[in-house]
Each structure stands twice: as structure tokens, then as C-alpha cells.
Amino acid sequence: MRRGLVLAFDTATPIAASALVRDGEVLGERASRAASVLADADDLLRGAGLAPADLDALVVGTGPGSFTGIRIGLAAARGLALALGIPAAGVSTLAALAAASPGGLPVIDAQRREVFTLVDGEPVARSPAELDFEPGTILIGDGAVRYRPELEAAGAEIPPDRDVVHVPRARFHVLLAGDFGDADLVEPIYVRAPDAEKAIA
Amino acid sequence: MRLILGLETSCDETAAALVTHDGDIRSNVVASQAVLHARFGGVVPEVASRRHLELVAPVIREALAEARASLDDVELVAVTRGPGLIGALLVGLSAAKALAWGRGLPLAAVDHLHGHVASLYLEPAPLEPPFLCLLATGGHTLLLDVRARSGYRSVGTTIDDAAGEAFDKGARLLGLGYPGGAALDRLAADGDPEAFDFPVARLDGLDFSFSGVKTALLYAVRALDAGELERRRADLAASYQRAIVRALVERTRAAAEQLGHERIAVVGGVAANSELRASLAEAVLAPLELCTDNAAMIASAARYLTPVAPPGFLELDAYAAA
Ligand SMILES: [Zn+2]
């Protein structure tokens, strides 16, 4: 975790998260859509009587999730890092979800009857039926909510649909952020190749 | 220096440019993805969007370096908002918003087609409206009534394929790969443009249709055996090119006459076509490097728009269709 004023946001999932953190203290958090994440950031800064130029570092969610959503966040981080000459760090959306619920397995809706989850710490896309977990494991994320009946039948514990643990919260991105550096080196986690690549592979 | 930073990511070129308020181009960086898409035989939106994300910050840095400028010299950010591939547009728009917001700069959201027209307003030979503009690219074929630099009115369009698309598809039928417009132009130079008669549909009004001529080429190719096809490829290319160019030229002149325009201009990638340049000799043409997608034209268009101050532009969305 980095000291100073840190803006974090994650636009990989349908509910985009942002947070403003100063020296580890959360000054504010927002949840909205990817397209509004910079407007949220502007709100957070104004609420604290601050401006973009006051930022010391950025943390951005790298997915997996919606391809377009991931890019909206990463393009914003690259533009902002360039504008302010500040470093950035990437944190996977799955890791941020898991951090909010220790021992929980993050499960993000990946569309096409699949979910994104972690297997041995690596992000993968799997059908819900293929998920491998001990009975009693807590599953969190919009994928866990979407496939609740079959996952619960397999022994998963899933908090109520409206529980905040199902949505990434950017305070956890700040908590997990390790290597700060050039924003261009923060890579998206797509997991899946473009369909066209598969078609000619 | 007081500069406009332009950013363009609507299709398969990632581009950044620095332009002065007087229309002087200080830098114009275009990272083309054509090679990346060649193996797919066309632009793949997801592949293009991924590449835009990789290139967006590097092209901005390169544009600044080439202009020997820093972000302190930039006082307006201009970005393409649409039309184009939505996922590709969003990369540029998101980066531009963040950059402008971070620097406390205003943002001008530019219509890509207005950008093509505004390529004519750049130094060293800026064009003053009124004029009739043929905008012909891989995605659009439009006849535009231009009365002021701040906009245009569309008076004709294609009802199916764009002219550039017709060239690319014809090139593919002739085994020239993708994108093949330029290769078709080169091959046509060795052929007889009267060898084959490829009819172009004549629509009422000022609209175009190029799907029929493409089908005619397909049938002509199928009617020839392999050896004969090889021998007559140049004739096919020349005749096909002649048919498309003739339709473009006729309609463009008719539109100019109807609207009382004394001057005709041509913008867009198809303006690079040698036969079009020769056939419409009276037309004003944008320099070749400004014909294809670039960011100098986006920065140029921004000079005639009212920019939005921060944070008003943060909720702006991209649009895919004109
Ligand atoms: Zn274009």
C-alpha cells in the first residue's frame, strides 16, 4: 500500500467501483457504471476539497470482466497517469473481491454460461459446473449470485444477493496494490482471446 | 506554444496529433494496425480495441516528442466520439477525458466525419467553404454540402457498401489480400478499363450503391478458368475501378451542380485512388497523409466547436452510428 493521496477504480464489472484513500484512510467510495467512473472520481475529490493535481498515485482494476469495461478503466488510468506524471498499480478484480471476504472464492459472471474465478491463484473462465471447491466454501461475486441454485446445490455458501461482498470495492484495490510504476505496464487480464483469434487458431 | 491535442481511435488506426489554433500541424502520429488485421481479412473490433489500449499513451507521447512540446503547451484536448467501432472509440474517449480532467483542460468531442472534412482546413492550403465534399472511406461514402467550417449537411450516401469497402472486397476477389484498395489501384494501372462492363446501379437522387458492381465482378471472376483469370486480372481490376470511380465522379458533379457549388473537395482514404484523382481533376484533395484516418483532422475540427470545460465532459458517451 502506498502513502499519499491514492485514487482507485475498477470498471471491469457492471458495477464500477471507485475510492479515494489518503495514507490508508478511506476518504470516500462510489459505485456506479464504467462510463461514470471519472465523474465519480471528480465527486470524491471535490468532496474532500481536493483536485486531480493533488493525486499521488492510481490503482486500477485489471479484470477479468467485460473487455470494454476493463479498457475504459485502463485507458483512463493511462491518460490520467500521463496527465499528472504519477505512478499506477494494477490489482485484479478477482483479488479485490476476495480481499473483502477472507477465505471466500471470487466468482465473476463471464457471460456465455461461464464465470471467471481463481484456480491456484490464476484467473480462468469455467462453466459453473466445473468449479472445484470444498463444501462450505463462501462464494462471492456476481457470478456466484447468478448461478446460486446450482452452486449451492454443490455445497457453496453464498451471502444474500444484496450483500456488498458481491461487488468489487476499490478500497481493497488500494490495500492490495503492490508495485507502482508506469501505467502503460499495467496489463489487462482478459483471460479469453478475441473470438476471431480462436476462429483462425 | 498553445496547442490542440487530437486523439483518434474510431477504427484501426491509433492516432495522436498536435495542431495550433491556426491549423499548423506540429505532429501527426498514426500507428496503423492494418498488418494486425490482415490475417483476419478485415478489421476485428476486439483485436482493434486491445491494440488501441496498448498504443494510446505511446502515440500521445510520440506526438508530443515530435512537436517538441510538453503537456504544458496543450490547452485543448480533441477526441473522436463517433461514428466508429464502439469499443475502439471508448479507449480514445476514456483516455482523452482522463487526460483533460487531470490537466484541468477543456475537451472537444469531435464527429469523425466532420474530422475528415476538417482535414481540408489545415495549413498550408486551407480551403474556405462553401464547397461540395465527397467523403469516401472504407466505412462511408457521403456527399456533403459544406457551408461553414463548423459542420456539414449530408445530401447523399451509399445504401449498401462504402466505396472503400467495394475496393477492398474487389481486391479480395482478385486475390490481393486485405486491405487491398491500394494494391487494386496498382494492378489496374496495367489493365484495360474498358475490357469488362461492370454496371453500377443508378439510384434516384444523390445516393450510391456498390453491392451490384461487386457481385458483377464476382460473376466475372467465376466465369474465367484459373489461367485466364491470371491473364486478365489487371483488366478486371481496371474495369472494376473505372466503374466505381465513374459512379463517384458522376454523382459528385451532379451534387455540386444541384447545390450550386463551384468547388468540389475529396476527403477520406479513397481520395488516394489514382483514377479518382485523375478523373476529378478539378477537385481539391487533402494531402495523402491526411486522407486516411489521423488525429490532425480531429484537432482541426475542434477549432470550430465549442469545447466543454471539466468536469462537464466526464459523462460524454461514444456513439457507433452517425
Ligand atoms: Zn475515417
Put a short name on every predicted segment.
Chain B
Residues 125, 148-190, 215, 219-222:
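Glycine-rich phosphate-binding loop plus the immediately following alpha-helix
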Residues 109-110, 264, 280-298:
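Conserved phosphate-binding/catalytic loops in two-lobed NTP-binding clefts
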